[in-house]
Every structure is written in structure tokens, then in C-alpha cells.
Amino acid sequence: WAKAGFRWIVNDAEHTQWEGFYGRDQNAIKGRLGLLAVQRLHREAISSYGDAYQLGARATMRPYGCTFEDAKIFFKSINFPEPGSPTPHDRGGYPVRNGDRTMNFTPVELRASETETQGWIQFETSEYLIDRKLRDKILQLMVAQGRNKACGFVGPLDVILRQGEIPEVNEAINDFFREATKLGIHTGRVVGSGSMEDPKDIEEGMVEAIKNGARLLSVHPLTSDMTLRGAFEMAAPFFRASKRCGF
């Protein structure tokens, strides 16, 4: 994957349950190859977000948010509490071992041990994409997390599933990219689908997203499909040659 140019991989525990929870070994392998490990979790998750960081994921993804409170709880769940003002959703404290086998036994050491992590919010419901007022409020919450600490990612399938084929979805997505870019927030989307398989169409979709400010672009096939798709690609010349020869 890394040699093909991929830079981040999402492990989807929202829809694949335990198979989608990557452990220390899988995350370490990706980290050594320069791949950002993004752990997507089920919408009910709270404690699991902090646990994912301890297992080596460097980013976590919150799907299907519909309210400002959903986003607020997510960012609480990936951060340790502020001294004197904890909430029920903050990460809990426990001794954590560093890669060099040293331990972090104090709150100061614990906070200092983990700085290069991100929280990704998925903008994939009509509440987050179509409702501009709520969207902008969440973007401001993301800004408050600090530079490069929060990213936004669009999966438009859920909007269409919930609302139907509404014409304003694509413009709402592009407007989201533009507004987030003004605030210094990195955003992205899946480009391609079962009804959009032509590489030329996918390329045009990626160009449109990039021009509107998106920087985190994802292909639509699952990584588990890459071997099959690669095999099809390698076998294709044989079948074209056979057809030309009358077989």
C-alpha cells in the first residue's frame, strides 16, 4: 500500500466489529511504513477512542454524528481531562508504557507522552452537512482543538441513505471543504462508488474535491479488495489477447 502511494488507512470497527479493531502489531507495521493508522469506531464508543491511541493508532474517526453534543463528547473522549474541570467523557488515567519501555506514572508524564494524535469527525449526515449553522459550530470546535489536531471527512452515502437523492449534497460538500480550509482544517472524502467506477470519472471527482480544498482523498474499494483488483488488472491483457484471437 505504501509503495502504491497510500498515506493513511482507515480500520473500520463501526461495520466490521472485532475484525476492524487493529492492535499494536498491525498499527506498528503501518507506522514503520509511513502509513497513518486511522481507527474508525462505532458511534456509541467513548473509552475505545483513547484505547485506540494506546494500541498505536494515531487518529480516530467518529461516524454518524447528528448533534453538537456528539462532536463535543468525541473530542472529550480523545483527550485527558483538564485539571479541576473533568467531565464524564474524558479519557481515564492509567500508567502507560512508552516505546522505550519507560513508564508514565504522573498526569504530567501521561499528557506529555502522547502529542501527535488526531480526531477525525465524519460529516456524513444531513445535520452536519446541510445545516450550515451546526456545521460551522462544529468547525469552530475543531479549531479549538489546536493546529492539525482535528480533521473532517465526508462520506456522502449516509446523507443520501437518510435524505434520498437531494441535489444540494454535492455543493454542501464542496462548501464544507472551502469553509474548513479557511479555518486551517484538513478535510477529505471518499471519491468513487459502485455507480462511479470509471477511473476518468473518479479522477474528475478528485480534481473537483482538491480544487475546493480537500486534501484527504480516499478510494472507494476496501483494502481487502486490492489483491483481487490487482489480479484482474494483471490478467486483463491475456483475456484481451484471447478475444482478439477468436477464443
Positions of predicted regions on the chain:
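Conserved anion-binding
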Residues: 58, 62-148, 153-161, 246-247
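Hydrophobic faces of well-ordered beta-strands that scaffold small-molecule active sites
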Residues: 9-11, 37-41, 59-62, 119-123, ...
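C-terminal active-site rim and adjoining tail of enzyme catalytic domains
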Residues: 190-247
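Glycine-rich, proline-tolerant flexible connector loops at the mouths of alpha/beta enzymes
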Residues: 2-26, 62, 152-171, 221
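Alpha-helix N-cap and loop-to-helix initiation/capping positions
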Residues: 66, 133, 165-172, 201
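Active-site-proximal loop/turn and secondary-structure-junction residues that shape catalytic pockets
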Residues: 15-17, 43-45, 64-66, 123-127, ...
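Alpha-helix-loop-beta-strand connector modules within alpha/beta enzyme cores
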Residues: 18-51, 77-88, 92, 98-100, ...
